[in-house]
Amino acid sequence: MAETVSPLKHFVLAKKAITAIFGQLLEFVTEGSHFVEATYRNPELDRIASEDDLVEIQGYRNKLAVIGEVLSRRHMKVAFFGRTSSGKSSVINAMLWDKVLPSGIGHTTNCFLSVEGTDGDKAYLMTEGSDEKKSVKTVNQLAHALHMDKDLKAGCLVHVFWPKAKCALLRDDLVLVDSPGTDVTTELDIWIDKFCLDADVFVLVANSESTLMNTEKHFFHKVNERLSKPNIFILNNRWDASASEPEYMEDVRRQHMERCLHFLVEELKVVSPSEARNRIFFVSAKEVLNSRKHKAQGMPEGGGALAEGFQARLQEFQNFEQTFEECISQSAVKTKFEQHTIRAKQILDTVKNILDSVNVAAAEKRVYSMEEREDQIDRLDFIRNQMNLLTLDVKKKIKEVTEEVANKVSCAMTDEICRLSVLVDEFCSEFHPTPSVLKVYKSELNKHIEDGMGRNLADRCTNEVNASILQSQQEIIENLKPLLPAGIQNKLHTLIPCKKFDLSYDLNCHKLCSDFQEDIVFRFSLGWSSLVHRFLGSTNAQRVLLGLSEPIFQVPRSLASTPTAPSNPAAPDNAAQEELMITLITGLASLTSRTSMGIIVVGGVIWKTVGWKLISVTLSMYGALYLYERLTWTTRAKERAFKQQFVNYATEKLQMIVSFTSANCSHQVQQEMATTFARLCQQVDVTQKHLEEEIARLSKEIDQLEKIQNNSKLLRNKAVQLESELENFSKQFLHPSSGES
């Protein structure tokens, strides 16, 4: 027989294809699970992926891992049933081209035997509930092992692993299950649940020397109740016995055929009449096994004593094998893989929906984030532009306010200087011309003037300055408010309280009047010095009096050291002193030479003109006036003179610092307003920083969302590709006829 490709390869190819697809599907769902989990657990991406999505896709990953393991263990399974000694083991051996299972006289299968291939070169068996691999070298050894194990009952399963190298049929993921006779047990339901639910094909091995028995029919009726239209083949074994009675062969064959057709079509209703004829065969398993063993040994197939009609029976057995292989491969592919294929499509649909929902949520949030980022960028630009404009306006406003304050302080201080005499007159303290008392008196007077002028200036300026500052601060705050968040606007008065501002005038009268020198020595109003002062002025009188009272050759004292001078003018330089000395010496020489003569002449003229009485009266009045002034020159008079001198001196000094004090006050106001504006600018800077951070966060979020969109699209494309592969698998293996049409 020419070698052809076995139909069983169809299952092998299908298993390989579906296993590869499920491997890709598991990899895809695992990748999708990691993607959804990373998206769900990202704290910056809220509500993009839900916990339900994560739980669902992780559940699919676990299910696919289990399905993958199940698929790797999937194989085609054919179960052989029949009465005891009907030749079930012989049929299996004939299909395997070797005597794998014990059969023949003295050998009955006392438990379920599962024959499958192993990649090793040694046969072994494993009993149910044990992982021990028991070595089996020969069939007789296998038979002995089965019969010697007293624990093996009819409902037990023994796995027989036969080297694939010795049997071609076992290379294609086919498992053959031999069973005890259906007439030896009443536990048919247990058998069916345990061994038949995953079988792809059932083979009823009947003895052609008798008809179908009720025990056989009863078993398959129960199978039909548990499975939907099971694939059942009927082998009428030992058909070689009909060769001894050739005249009855066709009648017996027709009789068996009719009963088998009735059983499959009418009773079980699993196939149509035309299909049923292809499920019923008349064979001799023993003949086929012997001929195939001869062929394997290089001997002729027809060698030995064979009954007549062997070739026909051999051909029918081969037809059975061909039909069986086609049926089981199609059936196994459908039963083993169709539901998994449908489940895979459902999983892909669900995962696609999850990816689509993530993609849509990411797209919506990305659009929202982009719009929000644009708003934040616009607001940041607006704040920066407004701050540039407001800074110029605030600088201008501060300049106006400081100039206004400087003018107010200058005017108020000028007025207070004019009223300095009143302030000095209000001062009361112990006065005495002694130096120690005068020192204390001057110190207290300086403090009184400083406190009084400071208080008066504050009364006149502080309220107006405060009102102006508060108004300006409120204007600045109102202008900056729109640049701040609502939460900061409500707390703005707490962050920047509008407190009362007190100007510090810092007159420092003690230091200002530290070089004041009082002149409280008694001076007669009609005395020579007073008259000279009155008519010549202080400077000229000083020069004249200095010239008359000094010796000619005496070096003149520095003007700064004159105790009687009300003020201390600056000492002349060396050249001026020398010039003054020469002039005085010349004048004194001339005056001294003429004084005596002048007095005598003037006195004589007056004496002759008015007489001595008038002179006496005049001298008496002059003396009385002198006496009056001398008596009234009391301590109080000295204090009044001291205060007047101090007022004149302090007025001159205070007028010198009017501009400085006003500038100092305006600087204080400028600092206060600048500080307030700086605090507001800090809040604006914080707002700008928050905006910049928010823009950076949104940009990062947008990039992440874009990446999520791209990843979800890539994963979805993989899902579509896997769907296409599943569809191709369905067309190629599950529905080949529809695919061809």
Swiss-Prot record:
Residues 178-181 are annotated as: G3 motif. It is an enzyme of class 3 (hydrolase). Detected in adult heart. Detected in embryos (at protein level). Widely expressed. Residues 9-73, 338-364, 703-734 are annotated as: Part of a helix bundle domain, formed by helices from N-terminal and C-terminal regions. Residues 266 are annotated as: G5 motif. The chain crosses the membrane at residues 585-605, 609-629. Residues 237-240 are annotated as: G4 motif. Residues 72-321 form the Dynamin-type G domain. Residues 1-584, 630-741 are cytoplasmic. Its EC number is 3.6.5.-. One of its GO terms (biological process) is mitochondrial fusion. This is Mitofusin-1. It comes from Mus musculus (Mouse). The gene is Mfn1.
